Each structure stands twice: as C-alpha cells, then as structure tokens.
Amino acid sequence: MSFKSIFLTGGVVSSLGKGLTAASLALLLERQDLKVAMLKLDPYLNVDPGTMNPYEHGEVYVTDDGVETDLDLGHYHRFSSVQLSKYSTATSGQIYTKVLTKERNGEFLGSTVQVIPHVTNEIINVIQSCADHHKPDILIVEIGGTIGDIESLPFLEAVRQFRCEHPQDCLSIHMTYVPYLRAAKEIKTKPTQHSVQNLRSIGISPDVILCRSEAPLSTEVKRKISLFCNVPEHAVFNAIDLERSIYEMPLLLAKENISDFLLNKLGFSPKPLDLSDWQDLVEALCDKERQHVRIGLVGKYLEHEDAYKSVFESLFHASVPANCSLELVPIAPESEDLLEQLSQCDGCLIPGGFGTRSWEGKISAARYCRERNIPCFGICLGMQALVVEYARNVLDKPLANSMEINPETPDPVVCMMEGQDSVVKGGTMRLGAYPCRIAPGSLASAAYKTDLVQERHRHRYEVNPSYIERLEEHGLKIAGVCPLGELCEIVEIPNHRWMLGVQFHPEFLSKLAKPHPLFIEFIRAAKAYSLEKANHEHR
C-alpha cells in the first residue's frame, strides 16, 4: 500500500475533541514534510448535514467542490494545509444510498445484501478513494460517535478488515476521557479500561491511547492504563483540558512527543519539530494586554456556539494581525434591548442563516450601524439584510423584502436565484467556490489587494438584478460580482466607516496562520472606532 493510515476513535463520552486532535496531528505530521489527507466518517443516516438543524449539529462546513460537511472539516482546514473535497467525508446515509443504488441496478447479481460484506466493503472503498484522490503519505481517518454506539459498528468493522489487510500500514488511536472525582480526590481509569475492552471486542486493539483529562496524568496512572489496556506505557498519551485556546492543542501533543511515536510506528524517520511560529501565533492570540475590542454578533443560532464556529474562529484569527483582544458579544435579534447592546459594541457582524425568525432584528441592527457609522459586516443572509434595509430606508421602499421572508412583497430586492425553486432541499443550493471580480477603489479591493478571488458559497437567494441600478444610484456600491452571470457578491456603503456585505462565506477560508483579509479589515475598523470613542470620552 502506498500510504499509511491512522484511525482515530473515541470512547467513554462524546465531545472529546477528536476533530481538534485529528487536525492537530495533521499539523504535526505536515511539519515532518509529509503529505496528509483527512477523512471524517459520520455514523448518522442523513446523507449530509446540509438540512440538519444547527442547534443539533452545529455549522455546515462547505468545501471548494461544494460538499456540505461536518464542522470538524473546518478544524482540519484551520490547523493544517490538507486539501478537503467530497472524498474527505462520508456518512452512513451516503454509504447506504450507494449500496441500495447498486442493489437496484443489479450490481450484486442477486446476492442477499448485508452489512457484512456489502456495507463494510463500501466503507473500505470510501477510505481507498480518499487516498487515491489525494495521494497522501498518511491518511488520518476520524470515526464519529462513541465506542458502544450501534451506529458506528459498520465503520469499526470496516476498519478492522482494513487493518487486517494492511497490518504494517495502519495504526489505531483511541481517545478516552479519564475523570477526576473531586470527592474522592482520585483519577479513575475504569471508564477507559471498559472503553478499550469494548473496542477490542470488536476486533480492534488500539496502538495508542490518548487520555483527555482535567489535570496531567501521573506516571502511575499511565502505567495502570497501560497494564489493563494492553498497550505499552510509552503509547499512553495525555491531552489535558486547554485553558486558553484550542490552538494550543498541537503544542500540547508535540510536548507529549506523540508524532515521533506515530512516525516510528508507521516506519518513518522523525525530524526535529519546530513549532516556534505556531507558538508565537498562539501567544499573540491569547494576549489579553492588547487593546480590547467588542464585536456584537447578531445571529439566529447563538445559543449553540458551534452553529457559527468558523465565524467565531475567523474573528479571533483576524485579531492577531489587527493587534487587539476580542470580546464576542452574542446578541439575539429578538432582544428588546438589541440597539442598546449594539451601542456598547465596536463593531457588528450579521452572519448567515435561513428562515423568517430574527429577520427584522437583523435589519434593525443593519440600520442602527449604518446611521451611526458603526463598522458592520454582513455575511450571506447578513448581506441580504443590509441590502433590504438600504432599500427600505434610503430608496424609500418601506415594503422591500427578501422573497425568502415574504414571497408576495411588492419590492423583492432579494429574490430566488434562477433554477433554485427545487422541492428537494438537500444539496441543491449554490454550493462551493466561485470566482468574484473585485471593483477597484473599494473596501474589498483594499482588503484583497487583487481584482479576482475565489470564495465559497451556500445560498439560494441573491440581490435582485432588476434593483441593482437603483441601489447604485442611491449610493450603494456593488464592489464584487461573479463573472459567471454577473451575480452580486459584495456590497459596500462608500461614505461609511466600514460597512460591507458578502454573499459568500469568507469564514470557510480563514486560518490562524492566514486570516481572511475581510475579517482583518473589519476588526481593524472596529479597533479604530473603539479608539475614537475612547479618545472622545477622555476629552
């Protein structure tokens, strides 16, 4: 086999941070001059997370080739340089759909279709296809869910078979939780022991046990885990809870020397690991002595932080080159004191979303920021809110609206794109990377410093082309359009401190090591506004 595989499973509890761990391992392995590919296997029966409730699943991360994926792929992108595509994700829904389609087409020649071998073979095909497409030195496969979940069993069986076929080229990491009982003042290893026993009963003996814990594990505890879980003591690693930032995870794992162990186990020769640049970025990100800037997020799903995970992280990324310390202030659009809360912020971000709830609150926020010259950034639905607000209060079209909100509006400033009126909702939006031509002399041009960019999209609605001329006549600047059909991509208000809306999702391209330019300029504008307010108060 031309590549090596690392399989990452989780036990004891969910939300252990397997995605962050996988992303951090990718960073460490890339620093060893190895090409890494990543694959997330999700046990749920949905074909993809595109139609799932954000409260249940978190954000939907979109790849360049237009695949709606799990938010863990966002972690992979933000930490590493891996190329993500449709080959980087698979769900039980996709696997079973493929199997049943083959059955209907007669490809199984009348055989009784079963989980073993048909479903497991399809899972193995997914693993192999990811490697064939990305051609990595090492493929990291994260298996969603928790050991013991019935949904994960076909994936684990497929991994067992794959390991049997390629015993020298595969490695299994099992991540567990080691609780600390405060009353007894003891660290308990029994849940980890049972989780490993469960995994071994399926036929997978882990090569590495990575223990998540509140505090560092003693040598005695590691020795006990080693003894009862049948792994060498030097294969028991510790991932303590991070106190400052998730971006400390690669530094923590590097300190544990886990990458050297993995490379030796897989037949590679480890090189000295230099993470000084990453350490500097983390220290800058966590520096609370920098100027304090408050950003209000006026969003629909703020009760669940993961619903806007990429937006939150992109703002923090931008705070490093902007040299400020960010405080993110969640503001419910339905709040009675919405405007009062905004008045205490240095900038406002209106993220994407769907549906009528909270729409008018977003429009109120956009108007407040426009009239009071407060930096404001609208993304996807947020941009549409900026445009509708402008049409209502500057074009004097009080009934202007989006057709998503009111299909009968007399002034449909935002309309459904041609060909988007499909009854089937899953995977039918305008998805993936499209080009955007930037207008010279615009805020967007100052940020990008180029006239053509590629950005990722996820939407059905657009600014109505029949209203663009009137919007421009009344001062709204169309600062970016898609050359493939002249679709409006970026709007700005020229005589404003910084007010910009984008139809795409710039948060899907931001990394700690390479923040997105629009987020940087937004945070810089908010910082300047904060300084201006402070100077005015001290006069």
From Swiss-Prot:
GO terms for biological process: 'de novo' CTP biosynthetic process; pyrimidine nucleobase biosynthetic process. L-glutamine binds at residues 55, 353, 381-384, 404, 460. InterPro entries: Class_I_gatase-like, CTP_synthase, CTP_synthase_N, GATASE, GATase1_CTP_Synthase, P-loop_NTPase. CTP binds at residues 14, 149-151, 188-193, 224. Allosterically activated by GTP, when glutamine is the substrate; GTP has no effect on the reaction when ammonia is the substrate. The allosteric effector GTP functions by stabilizing the protein conformation that binds the tetrahedral intermediate(s) formed during glutamine hydrolysis. Inhibited by the product CTP, via allosteric rather than competitive inhibition. It catalyses: UTP + L-glutamine + ATP + H2O = CTP + L-glutamate + ADP + phosphate + 2 H(+); L-glutamine + H2O = L-glutamate + NH4(+); UTP + NH4(+) + ATP = CTP + ADP + phosphate + 2 H(+). Residues 294-532 form the Glutamine amidotransferase type-1 domain. It is an enzyme of class 6 (ligase). The keyword Transmembrane does not apply. One of its GO terms (molecular function) is ATP binding. Keywords: ATP-binding, Glutamine amidotransferase, Ligase, Magnesium, Metal-binding, Nucleotide-binding, Pyrimidine biosynthesis. The keyword Ligase applies. It holds the Pfam family GATase. One of its GO terms (cellular component) is cytosol. Its EC number is 6.3.4.2. UTP binds at residues 14, 188-193, 224. Residues 1-268 are annotated as: Amidoligase domain. Mg(2+) binds at residues 72, 142. Pathway: Pyrimidine metabolism; CTP biosynthesis via de novo pathway; CTP from UDP: step 2/2. ATP binds at residues 15-20, 72. The active site is at 380 (nucleophile), 505, 507. Belongs to the CTP synthase family. CTPSs have evolved a hybrid strategy for distinguishing between UTP and CTP. The overlapping regions of the product feedback inhibitory and substrate sites recognize a common feature in both compounds, the triphosphate moiety. To differentiate isosteric substrate and product pyrimidine rings, an additional pocket far from the expected kinase/ligase catalytic site, specifically recognizes the cytosine and ribose portions of the product inhibitor. Catalyzes the ATP-dependent amination of UTP to CTP with either L-glutamine or ammonia as the source of nitrogen. Regulates intracellular CTP levels through interactions with the four ribonucleotide triphosphates. Homotetramer. This is CTP synthase. It comes from Chlamydia trachomatis serovar A (strain ATCC VR-571B / DSM 19440 / HAR-13).
